[in-house]
Amino acid sequence: LGLQNATSPIMEELIAFHDHALMIIFLISSLVLYIISLMLTTKLTHTSTMNAQEIEMIWTILPAVILIMIALPSLRILYMTDEFNKPYLTLKAIGHQWYWSYEYSDYEDLAFDSYITPTYFLEPGEFRLLEVDNRTTLPMEADIRVLISSQDVLHSWAVPALGVKTDAIPGRLNQAMLTSTRPGLYYGQCSEICGSNHSFMPIVLEFIYFQDFEVW
C-alpha cells in the first residue's frame, strides 16, 4: 500500500510534501503522547498555576511556526500545478456517462472515444476494470496541456502516477499540465461519483518516444 511511483515532476514534489507533512505529524503526536504519559505517571501537574507567560508564548509561537513549515511547501506545489509553459501538444478530454472522449487538435482533426474493455476481452497481463479499447498516446518528456470538460454531469480526470486530478464540469474548460519522465502505460479513473457506472470509466495514457509519436 502507498502512493504510486512518480513519473512526473509534480508527483515527485507531492510525494516529498507527503513525507514532509507526515514527519511533522509524527513528531507532534509523539510529543503529545509523551506529555500525556508524564502526566499519568508523574506529578507533572500544577493546579495552582494562574499565569505563565512563557508557556503561553511557547504554545502560541510553536504552532504558528509549524503551520508555516507546512504551508510554504504546499503553496509552492500549488503554484507549480498552475504554471503553464508553452505546451508541445494540447489534448482535450471530455467526460460522458460513462466513457471518455479525446481530441487532438494540434496536428489534425483526430478524435476518438475510450470505453472500458469488458473482462472477457482482456488479454493475459491486462488489468481488470482499468483497460480501455482506445489508449491515449502522448509523447514523453514534453509539456502537454489537457483541456478537460464534461458533456453531461460532473466527472474528474485523474491519473495518480502523474499527480493529476482535474474536475470535468459541464460548460466549463479546466486545464492541467502533463509531463512524463519515462515511457509506459499509466492508469487512472474518474474520481467524481457520476452515476451507476462511475467505476467503469478508466483512463489509460501511453507515453512513447518523440520519434514514435510523430510516426503514430
UniProtKB/Swiss-Prot annotation:
One of its GO terms (biological process) is ATP synthesis coupled electron transport. CDD domains: CcO_II_C. It holds the Pfam family COX2_TM. It is an enzyme of class 7 (translocase). Component of the cytochrome c oxidase (complex IV, CIV), a multisubunit enzyme composed of 14 subunits. The complex is composed of a catalytic core of 3 subunits MT-CO1, MT-CO2 and MT-CO3, encoded in the mitochondrial DNA, and 11 supernumerary subunits COX4I, COX5A, COX5B, COX6A, COX6B, COX6C, COX7A, COX7B, COX7C, COX8 and NDUFA4, which are encoded in the nuclear genome. Component of the cytochrome c oxidase, the last enzyme in the mitochondrial electron transport chain which drives oxidative phosphorylation. The respiratory chain contains 3 multisubunit complexes succinate dehydrogenase (complex II, CII), ubiquinol-cytochrome c oxidoreductase (cytochrome b-c1 complex, complex III, CIII) and cytochrome c oxidase (complex IV, CIV), that cooperate to transfer electrons derived from NADH and succinate to molecular oxygen, creating an electrochemical gradient over the inner membrane that drives transmembrane transport and the ATP synthase. This is Cytochrome c oxidase subunit 2.
